[in-house]
């Protein structure tokens, strides 16, 4: 098919490329009917350029479209070559003072909390950095795409509207000039023509609905039968459904289907098939059939290719228009005129209207293109922004209706543009007054919530999924209303008043439909069967909370509006209460000679609703009357006399009683829906406009009525009237007959009622209720939150109510009430309450939940005990009420109140006769305290002529009336003071009596004689001193008692030791032996310790006893006993890698014998240090395996460990492990017990001997491999072969280990091989020993790096688990050859040896530059016993070790010299060169000679010696660790201290001369020839000639990448990152690899790749190439660190970025500026260096099971 198309397509291209834009434009300039000309041109050319085949070629299409279609338009517009025309236009244009940058997805945006008018006012990064706001309290978020930078918009900022860049452009914007003055008449006319035609064309073709014919003026003569099957996006179907359907319908691979689905999701549509009509129709029917089962089917259309072509070009044109108008404001103005010009069809016929009204029919891509155009044109031209806003408002209802029917998110709907108009204060006011916008929004909202009950209230019963979906969409209207109200008017016009009040009426209608919705009735007898729907109503309430507050703020800003609004609200409340007394019979209540009429109503029997927005709004307005003093200025205008207090309090009181009854457990059978409703009613998100307002409404009612009447009504509603109105009710009640439940219930109700009274009198911190301001209110909230416990900033913010701007006002007051404590390495910064604020603590603070109240009480009492104060928590001193609420305090001294208090105290005095509770008494005491504080304040503030009418002290001193003669309240308190059963409340009662006396004294003293008062204080003082002395005495007694007890205990201990002397003697000996094993305490401090060689320090072998963690049995570690093992974890590692791009192509054929110095991938072993018997471990592992198989049959979930890969959790510490290391005695001591001669060979002799032995072995090896028929010849050859003296190649040493130990040696060896090479286990494979030695070497190198990086001494105190792991690993590696084939190990030794001492049989060996010398050393030393065991000539193993070590050290020195950097640092030493420097210079000259002078010029000896010392240090340290663990020689004490470099000490410990070059001098004869052979290697030559690289020494430590100090620069970097697979599209989840700095696109289909036959996400794939399976990433949009290991393991980790309050912000929800915390970043780096990432993930997954369910491999 393709080949047929090719020539034809090329021909088309040729004809297109021959078009001349200039000629076409010239033709258009002459044309009489320009529209027809342009349309004909487009009809002819567009289908030839776009949509030529199944797959689009965007680059080619764009190039041709520019040449053939857009070029002529640009020529026509400019009247000349656009390359000159546009720059001229640009020059004539004045730069804009508006920034207007449209945000990309994920770009950082900044808002200033001090200056922004509302949170939608944001700046782009560039403007922000150049603005004054960077030093303010700013918020940083990532944009969801769309939206503008508001720099330059004076209405958006209270100050600093311009950044430095845009301020330069503000000089001449005094008066708004017409931008067209800068353009010539011709240009204006031509622009007008071309814009009108192209804009109309684009709108027409994009809104075209026919699928196979074009508009008449675009139809072609000959039409091909080519169609597209076009799939459209919807938000209903999932990715998986779409992918599956496409695979079936168009027969494509999964990868192609994913590609299609990704494009559909991104652009809104994609063709999935190209061909004739029938072919496409068939695919369509399959798609529709497959997706219509559960939901509506996917939208698919079969469209003619020419229509798709024109639509694609239509989009291109809109983008083109957007870029053209960027050249000049004049062009922008013309485009706006064209767009908003009414067409011939009148209303809604302008192009802009047509596009807006077709919005929901357009696909995603088309929408975003035209929204973009509107933003860069209409919204950037202030004159037309206004006109556009009017069109938007006129079409508002229709647009919202379309949005409700649409299923796309609001972000891609034109309705989302509302934020651009409604938040601009002048535009919003204009729309309210001219277009009645407020009423329109609310009415549109009401239209969509049609379900009502018989009373006309909203009914959300049993929402279907679709209704719930619609309801979610309807909520966006509330957001629009919030935008309109967000900035309060500073001045009011009459029209604004009128229209606002019309809107307020509409709002009251909305609230009226909510008043009393979702009513509930108490379930009696049986539990409710179906949980009623409650969420929708609360969602509505939550969304409206801010709107209700803002409505009140608007009312408060104008007195006339406030009065009118109050009247309207009252009228609506009267309507709601229309049937308030109907059908409910009146009753009369009387207590203490007061009586009141009310209705019979029981909350526990009738319907009751928690939703009372109208009452609550009235309460809010009533407080505003008080706050703004309107109530006192214009009482005649207010209907205050018409108010019926009983009616006002009725519904809020019912609501509070409902809460009390729920708490008393009376509504248990109503299920969770009610519990949830009560929770949200009090919750910080809703309480401001629910619970708080109910309290205010009750305060309002009480302040207007006789408090006795109120209390009686309240008792009646609480269903407690009987108890307090009949004197002996309590006695009867407590007799045996009654139900315990009922007693408990009534007690709780009494407690709740008393709590309510405390609230009504005590809660006066709302401005308008009490004489306070807003900051007092916030301070009080914070004090009470911090009195529970110290809190982090974010916790505090969560517990405070936010206003519409997401502000709590906390920052302005927090310094006054709290201290800030900075965080450590983990945790967060905390605020602690200042001690002086504790006195403001109110135990019955109304925003405490039950749990918080008890915590706060506990905390405050504890604090008082610590400060040696009494533990009473008296009520705090309160601010006075505002005049409107002043009469509220009288409730405390009303007769009914005193009766209630008296009754409860009476119960407490006769505590056995009645049912009462301590909580009840505690509340009564609190109320008495409040009354006393109140009276005290009245007396303190009294003026001459006033009499204090508050006489609580007198009333509580009076005993009861005649017949009963009950004692006075005061008398009862004095009785209770000494009651033993009220220990807890003693302090409080004492405080009350003390305060009572003080108040009494104040009453008695007239204003002229204040003497009595001072006496009172003196008396108080003396009593306080007494208290103090008493406490001191008690403390002293307690101290003496403690000392006596301690003395007795130590005497008993001594006695016990004396009696059991011999027992202690044994344990002490044992302790000494175990500590010797642990601490390697030096044997003799004065002798030199040597780790290897014939002079090795001989250490007596300590016996080692260990205990199995599984069976608790103790056992000695011996050669012949059962194996003991350590749990271990082996993993591949690139932590030390200097080359991450290396990859083993074919692990089956790879030979790991030589490790390259770049350490590209090593095998690391770690252990938690816990010991088990091998057989116990085997049993444990089998049970884990069996359990896992059972679990897999039940659940297809991953666990934190992968049993199939041999993983398990350590039974003790749950540390992830995948194998076990056997515990062994030092293996060298076992094999080294042969006779050793005293004269050992020197290096030269030893090398010759070894070379001969190797030759013999190779000869025999050859013999064995030759076929038998040549046997006669062979025997001659054997004679010919002179075996070196004492060498017996046929000897096989006896292996001393028990079977169990051998098995474990094999187990661990195989595990290392399997993990290290990523192959299947095979214990016979010759590479197993190599991998064991490699793991030992690599692990030691890792530890050495960690110690060096942290400047810790080499043999300082290592953590136990590390020490055990290194010891066991080294001993294992040294013993492993015993279970491998001797000849294989010998073969490895020969090859390793040949890399340093060349022989003829090994040709292809790496050159000296390409061998890591420490790996080579470990390999040679550990393979050597396989050769040495056949040598009976008396050469000891130690000699071999020493010579190998010296040889490798010399090779390493040569490596260092060859690669040393010879740039001089200008630091030449003045002194004469020392011995080392001369020696190293001589050696360098030798090298210079052997390399044929290719080596660089000879630097100074000082410089060379410094290079050698620095370069060899890591090697020496690793060697010291290795030989220390291999031979068990303790480390010299000098190396155990931090500080100096320890070079000399290391040399001495390792049997090296301090002047390392002496090694060369002592063995010069053999060394010179070896050096020559090393330098002759062609690779060395290539390196010296600059043709290749080599590693330099010392290797630098790898670090994680450098992160920027400020997090926003990371966000910015990530927002510029395009997904590599989706054609320049911004990535949705940019993720930064912290190891190498690559940015990846994670968590989306686009970047999945295949790894080992499975689909994996970009991060997982990257971990394999960069971290050999382990990855550390930072998810930039979430500010979250991601750890990955393998394909199934991962966890999230706390990021290293903190805000100013020491907290992380995962998910960037709070938006506080974040800065890098270096310590936390170091901690992550340390985890990486220590290879602990996998362990960290394991622990996290065990601790949090939700992590196991995450699909890590697709991240």
Swiss-Prot record:
EC category: transferase
Annotated positions of the Phosphoserine modification: 476, 1694
Pfam annotation, one family: ClpS
Modification after translation (UniProt): Dephosphorylated by DUSP22 at Ser-1694 and Tyr-1697, leading to subsequent ubiquitination and proteasomal degradation. 'Lys-48'-linked ubiquitinated at Lys-94, Lys-779 and Lys-1599 following DUSP22-mediated dephosphorylation of Ser-1694 and Tyr-1697 which promotes UBR2 interaction with the SCF(FBW1A) E3 ubiquitin-protein ligase complex.
Composition bias, Basic and acidic residues: 1021-1034
Binding site for Zn(2+) 4: 1108, 1111, 1173, 1176
UniProt name for this protein: E3 ubiquitin-protein ligase UBR2
Organism: Homo sapiens
